UniProtKB/Swiss-Prot annotation:
Its main location: cytoplasm. This is ATP-dependent RNA helicase RhlB. PANTHER family: ATP-DEPENDENT RNA HELICASE RHLB, ATP-DEPENDENT RNA HELICASE RHLE-RELATED. A motif (DEAD box) lies at residues 165-168. One of its GO terms (biological process) is RNA catabolic process. Belongs to the DEAD box helicase family. RhlB subfamily. Gene3D superfamilies: P-loop containing nucleotide triphosphate hydrolases (3.40.50.300). The gene is rhlB. One of its GO terms (molecular function) is RNA helicase activity. A motif (Q motif) lies at residues 9-37. Residues 243-390 form the Helicase C-terminal domain. InterPro entries: DEAD/DEAH_box_helicase_dom, DEAD_box_RNA_helicase, Helicase_ATP-bd, Helicase_C-like, P-loop_NTPase, RNA-helicase_DEAD-box_CS, RNA_helicase_ATP-dep_RhlB, RNA_helicase_DEAD_Q_motif. DEAD-box RNA helicase involved in RNA degradation. Has RNA-dependent ATPase activity and unwinds double-stranded RNA.
Length: 429
């Protein structure tokens, strides 16, 4: 683990219970990140907290350590029913809920606290069987949690800790009514520890915090550097005609070890995926229409390196802990300026450098002013040479293209990213 993103503060100095500390140290967590060093002392003292930090800075470990610690130091005075969890952690997506559960599982063994997972799309009966045995900490998405609540599988009247992760994404996905429904079934804010974490804390998120939390402390990490000091940003202005060929040309020039390509719609994602796959890249597709089991398999393959490129909608832009992403390509500039920050935050994590390349095409260039205003700096512009764009790629059968291709053999990426037939770069010097 790189130490460049850590502080000199140790978890052992945070006042955590020995069981929690043992769980953290067993997984190699000794030094705190900035968000952990600032938030844990407040949480250990019992203060509610609304924390803002860039993705990949350790928010998850911060709220998990605080949750386990609070439950160990605040035993219930009266016996609880088997269907009454003591803590609830809400996430906007299934993938994020699963990742939080996996992180929590590394700590739970040393604490004796039981975990439950609840998310939609699959596994209802399997999840139900675990919940019926009783859990201390319930992690999940709001829709499935509400399903279990209405079926009386769970009762929230003994909740001692509540965590809302990626709160602004909850608003974006329209889950705010679900969140308020669940909050109102829990004990009053003064009777529980509440945490809200997000990469951004918009006004609407702060209003939610004041509505359902007990005078929360606010913690922010590097708010002036919205996009991360280790991310090299770059912007091109392609015509719609050149856009796909520019992406393919840049992909060949950069030859990234691990890249995510973002587009604004699933249909465009499908087209981009088809072009990249047809061009010989090991590429996966992640959109809302992909079945849950396949989504998890794609993420697993991408994480372990079986896939080099992931094409995704913003469903993958928030919260997912995918290590070692070297490049992010914004094939479409996002409509929401905050999503630009979340997208490129997939790279440049854990003290490593990253590269973000955005294409401001004819359809989405108008999103650029709002993005640059939000991040407080202009994105450096690069020019490209149309004559240097790939002209020997074969279009996928179901995609109609404007420029006539010439057939060529697909490149082989099975060797892990070595290109033996490099073309002259499309960038103008």
């Amino acid at each position: 683990m790189s130490k460049t993103h850590l502080t000199t503060e140790k978890f052992a100095q945070m006042g955590l219970e020995p069981e929690v500390l043992a769980g953290l140290e067993s997984k190699g967590f000794h030094y705190c990140t900035p968000i952990q060093a600032l938030s844990l002392p407040l949480l250990v003292e019992g203060h509610d907290l609304a924390g803002q930090a860039q993705t990949g800075t350790g928010k998850t470990i911060a709220f998990l350590a605080a949750t386990f610690n609070y439950l160990l130091t605040h035993p219930l005075s009266n016996p609880r029913l088997v269907n009454q969890p003591r803590a609830i952690i809400m996430a906007p997506t299934r993938e994020l809920a699963v990742q939080i559960y996996n992180d929590a599982d590394t700590i739970s063994a040393s604490t004796g606290l039981k975990l439950g997972l609840a998310y939609g799309g699959e596994g209802y009966d399997k999840q139900l069987a675990v919940l019926e045995q009783g859990v201390d900490i319930l992690i999940g998405t709001t829709g499935r949690i509400i399903d279990y609540f209405k079926s009386k599988v769970i009762d929230l009247s003994n909740i001692q800790v509540v965590v809302l992760d990626e709160a602004d994404r909850m608003f974006d996905l329209g889950f705010i009514k679900d969140i308020r429904f669940l909050f109102r079934r829990m004990p009053a804010p003064t009777e529980r520890l509440s945490m809200l974490f997000s990469a951004t804390l918009s006004l609407r998120v702060q209003e939610l915090a004041y509505e359902h939390m007990n005078h929360p402390e606010h913690v922010q990490i590097e708010p002036e550097q919205m996009t991360g000091i280790r991310i090299q940003e770059e912007l091109f202005y392609p015509s719609n005609e050149d856009k796909m060929l520019l992406l393919l040309s840049l992909m060949e020039e950069e030859w990234p070890e691990k890249a995510i390509v973002f587009a604004n719609t699933k249909h465009v994602c499908e087209d981009v995926h088809a072009w990249l796959e047809n061009d010989g890249h090991r590429v996966g597709l992640l959109t809302g229409d992909v079945p849950q089991k396949k989504r998890m398999k794609i993420l697993e393959d991408f994480t372990k390196g079986t896939l080099d490129i992931l094409v995704a909608t913003d469903v993958a832009a928030r919260g997912l802990h995918i290590p070692d992403v070297t490049h992010v390509f914004n094939y479409d500039l996002p409509d929401d300026a905050e999503d630009y920050v979340h997208r490129i935050g997939r790279t440049g994590r854990a003290g490593k450098s990253g590269h973000s390349i955005s294409l401001a095409c004819e359809d989405y260039a108008f999103n650029l002013p709002a993005i640059e205003e939000y991040i407080h700096h202009p994105i450096p512009v690069s020019k490209y040479d149309r004559e240097a764009l790939l002209d020997d790629v074969t279009a996928p059968k179901r995609v109609v293209r404007n420029r006539q291709p010439v057939n060529r053999n697909m490149r082989d990426r099975q060797g892990g990213g070595n290109s033996n037939n490099r073309r002259r770069p499309p960038r103008k010097s």
